[in-house]
Amino acid sequence: MLTMDDIVREGHPALREVASEVTFPLSDEEKKLGHDMLEFLINSQDEELAEKYGLRGGVGIAAPQLAVTKRILAIHVHDEKDRLYSYVLYNPKIRSHSVQQACLSGGEGCLSVDREVPGYVVRSERVTIDAFDENGIPLKLRFKDYPAIVVQHEIDHLNGIMFYDHINKENPSYLPPDVDVFG
C-alpha cells in the first residue's frame, strides 16, 4: 500500500523529467503501480484510512510523483453531478481541448507540494484524452470542469510541469476575462 512516504516532493528530479511511454504488454510491475496509485487515491478519500495512515486527500496522482518516470496516471474524482471518474491511464495524451478556460477558485494543490501556492492555474475547461488501459485497449475519454482540471494537472506531471508553472508570476491573482471559476 502506498503512503505519503512514497510520494516525492518538489525538488526531486523525477518531477521535472518528461516521462517515457510504456510498451504493451505491460510488465507486472507497471500494472501493480497503476493499481497501487488508484488504491492510494481511494484510500486517501476515506476518512478512517486517511487518518490511520496519515494520507493527504488526493484526486489524482502520476507515476513521476513516485519517482517512476513512466507515462502512467490515476484519477479518482467526482464531478458536480457526483459522477465518478476513476481510471488508471497509460500513455495519456490530450487529443483536443476547448477554447473556453477554467480554474479553481482556491488555486490548485499537489501531493508533491507541501506548501500553499497562491494563484490561479488557468486550464482548458474540456479535454478529450487518448490513452490505454492496462490491457493495451485504446480509450478515448472526455472530461469537463473539475475532472478536466485534474487530468490536465496529472498529464502535466508526465511532462515535467508543476501546477505553479502556470501561475502568473507578476500577478498570481490575475484572472483573464471569460475564465470559468469552479469551487
UniProtKB/Swiss-Prot annotation:
Binds 1 Fe(2+) ion. Fe cation binds at residues 110, 153, 157. The active site is at residue 154. It catalyses: N-terminal N-formyl-L-methionyl-[peptide] + H2O = N-terminal L-methionyl-[peptide] + formate. The keyword Zinc does not apply. It is an enzyme of class 3 (hydrolase). GO terms for biological process: co-translational protein modification; translation. Its cofactor is Fe(2+). Disulfide bonds: none annotated. It holds the Pfam family Pep_deformylase. Its EC number is 3.5.1.88. The keyword Protein biosynthesis applies. InterPro entries: Peptide_deformylase, Peptide_deformylase_sf. One of its GO terms (molecular function) is peptide deformylase activity. Keywords: Hydrolase, Iron, Metal-binding, Protein biosynthesis. Removes the formyl group from the N-terminal Met of newly synthesized proteins. Requires at least a dipeptide for an efficient rate of reaction. N-terminal L-methionine is a prerequisite for activity but the enzyme has broad specificity at other positions. Belongs to the polypeptide deformylase family. This is Peptide deformylase. It comes from Listeria welshimeri serovar 6b (strain ATCC 35897 / DSM 20650 / CCUG 15529 / CIP 8149 / NCTC 11857 / SLCC 5334 / V8). The gene is def.
